Amino acid sequence: MGPTASGKTALAIDMATQYNCEIISVDSALIYRDMNIGSAKPSAEELEMAPHKLIDILDPSESYSAADFRRDALLAIEDIISRGKTPLLVGGTMMYFKALLEGLSPLPSADEAIRQQILAQAQTEGWEALHQELCNIDPVAGERIHPNDPQRLSRALEVYRISGKTMTELTQTKSAALPYDVVQFAIAPNDRKVLHELIAKRFNIMLEQGFIEEVARLKARDDLHLELPSMRCVGYRQCWQYLDNEFDHATMVEKATAATRQLAKRQLTWLRSWPDLQWLESGVEGNLVTLMRQSR
């Protein structure tokens, strides 16, 4: 685990190529095909050296829930173990980790028709009005979910409209926790400034690699828009808005790196309260040895 740009992928590939491990990606951006540069997806050469499960499994027009991830990850874990290898789960989507380790409440599957109804309502009335609707239906969820978080707000309303029960009611029970022993590590720089520098450096590299052109190709499709989970991934939204001439290139870079720093902050907030977690410092020699020694 770890915040974005902390060096998780490089360490995981080192581990997978030197030990009897196979990687399962725990990343809500890497699941999408044709989103390679902005998601910092491992290169074709890296994937050949160390294949990753749960990468490139969806089109950007599709949605994917934590429940979907848990189902697919459990199947991947069983497959890897059956071949005598050790599953190595790597990523920064903390909700996916939480769902896998602790189990999930029995929430209804996504309903695209209802989701589109909610989106249309948001476009006419605004997300603030929908947030007030949620507060009236489910005050606990309304307090927890910010009006500027359309993905979670939409899901809470969708659950209620499908089932007639609130998210709070349905989350009182959970499925069984992960039936395996898990050793958990997090990697991050000790200094926040170093992480911010890594984020800025990586985004500049993405631009050099053709990130704007990647987003332009996605934007040229007639089935993608900014309300989709794929297009809400950090960097993609800001670059899309730049291509729409909402702001200039320098502002796009500033907004994208700021959004990435906010993502890293949220990830670190999760990790600081995560139980049974062992920490590694980014860029330190010997991390792989430490990882293997403490995993035994």
From Swiss-Prot:
Disulfide bonds: none annotated. Its EC number is 2.5.1.75. It is an enzyme of class 2 (transferase). Substrate binds at residues 4-9. The record marks 93, 115 as: Interaction with substrate tRNA. It comes from the Bacteria. ATP binds at residues 2-9. It catalyses: adenosine(37) in tRNA + dimethylallyl diphosphate = N(6)-dimethylallyladenosine(37) in tRNA + diphosphate. One of its GO terms (molecular function) is tRNA dimethylallyltransferase activity. Keywords: ATP-binding, Magnesium, Nucleotide-binding, Transferase, tRNA processing. InterPro entries: Dimethylallyltransferase, IPT, P-loop_NTPase. Its cofactor is Mg(2+). Residues 27-30, 151-155, 232-237 are annotated as: Interaction with substrate tRNA. One of its GO terms (biological process) is tRNA modification. PANTHER family: TRNA DIMETHYLALLYLTRANSFERASE. Monomer. This is tRNA dimethylallyltransferase. It comes from Shewanella frigidimarina (strain NCIMB 400).
